[in-house]
Amino acid sequence: MADYLISGGTGYVPEDGLTAQQLFANADGLTYNDFLILPGFIDFTADEVDLTSALTRKITLKTPLISSPMDTVTEADMAIAMALMGGIGFIHHNCTPEFQANEVRKVKKFEQGFITDPVVLSPSHTVGDVLEAKIRHGFSGIPITETGTMGSKLVGIVTSRDIDFLAEKDHTTLLSEVMTPRNELVVAPAGVTLKEANEILQRSKKGKLPIVNDRDELVAIIARTDLKKNRDYPLASKDSHKQLLCGAAVGTREDDKYRLDLLTQAGADVIVLDSSQGNSVYQIAMVHYIKQKYPHLQVIGGNVVTAAQAKNLIDAGVDGLRVGMGCGSICITQEVMACGRPQGTAVYKVAEYARRFGVPVIADGGIQTVGHVVKALALGASTVMMGSLLAATTEAPGEYFFSDGVRLKKYRGMGSLDAMEKSSSSQKRYFSEGDKVKIAQGVSGSIQDKGSIQKFVPYLIAGIQHGCQDIGARSLSVLRSMMYSGELKFEKRTMSAQIEGGVHGLHSYEKRLY
């Protein structure tokens, strides 16, 4: 018998791979392409993988995906789409406070349970008022009360069916002449549960269901469109009022307090303090201010890349941390400022420290593929923030343009001179608003059209689930537990290994991801 054969079965398995602790034990800075995760044992299907993960101490998402607060990535359309698919979007602040607050308001109004502050008109208003409300708010199903306010006696409702075929000369017609009167309405009594109200609405086949008290006064309304959204987007991120979750970015200067007030009034659920280097007296002071004035508001600090930076913000009271410095595709901070850290190392080091205090970590930057998302989550990140990966989608701000026959959208770093020249908010992010000479920490560019994130994000979700399946983790919490226990094994990649792991040896090929 050959001396290399083992008797007694296959109980012996040699140690293979590195634990995360061993991977990051030396002083080398590693990023996502520098290592791989070794596969585990599969005893479940990919669609069984639970992607629920914490955004902050008190907010949990069903999908660990976040859109970055950049002016070429996230405004209302992106934030709505991200929330519908289980993630969240952060509205950028390279704009006026009023514009930003209005974008948050659009997200919060997109889907609601009981709508307690709907647009209400009186019988003496005109058809023109309804059309104006439709332009401003995007809908025309408007309840009519005696005084045109909530809490007043319900007398009817105006829908698009009542006014669709009216000529322009009829825009001065009073609503009392065109509305559907109270005696033809289906209503529900105050105190009804949302589930019961939705059942009544389904049976009635109406577009809106007014909720009235025993004096027939309007107290709320629910919309049929929200029923459809519930059916079509089961993973949607919602608050306790069944409105979509929405985040917003603010700076750390004194005038940002006014912006913060408007954002909280608009209904923002979480605030991210937007700074390229978060370990500053300015950010610590702003965290203290927010926690004192708005104790219910969740605050994400950052950006940080070391445990020492994280400590100061955790001590200040942040509910989450944003990790990354100079690793974004449009960021040149490491090149210009000589500061930063490779993103793989940054995520692991900060997450390993912050978890001891129950503070979730967002991996922000350097995400180029769905594999990078899986690696970031495997290193301890609870969620992943994306900029370039979501840029040039239909929902991203900006207009498409063509160059050499390719459909493109502009994408720029918030530290680029383009962004700084648009608004001082992006200058504050890099502590340069008072400088005579602006030091760019980002570039402007363009990205090829990716289509709608309604297709792209489901691809990312499925990719994460398949990655976790190959690893042998049924959920993201299991994935992190495997990493910290040492069960999850990694391996460094040489440059040759990275080339081998990509497409190679072909004369030509087409790379279709979804």
UniProtKB/Swiss-Prot annotation:
The record's Gene Ontology cellular component field reads: cytoplasm; nucleus
Where's the active site on this chain?
C331 (thioimidate intermediate), R429 (proton acceptor)
Q: What is its EC number?
A: 1.1.1.205
Cofactor(s) annotated in UniProt = K(+)
Where along this sequence does the record place binding of NAD(+)?
Answer: D274, S275, S276, G324, M325, G326
Top-tier EC class: oxidoreductase
Q: Which reaction does it catalyse?
A: IMP + NAD(+) + H2O = XMP + NADH + H(+)
* Descriptive protein name: Inosine-5'-monophosphate dehydrogenase 1
Give me the gene this protein comes from: IMPDH1
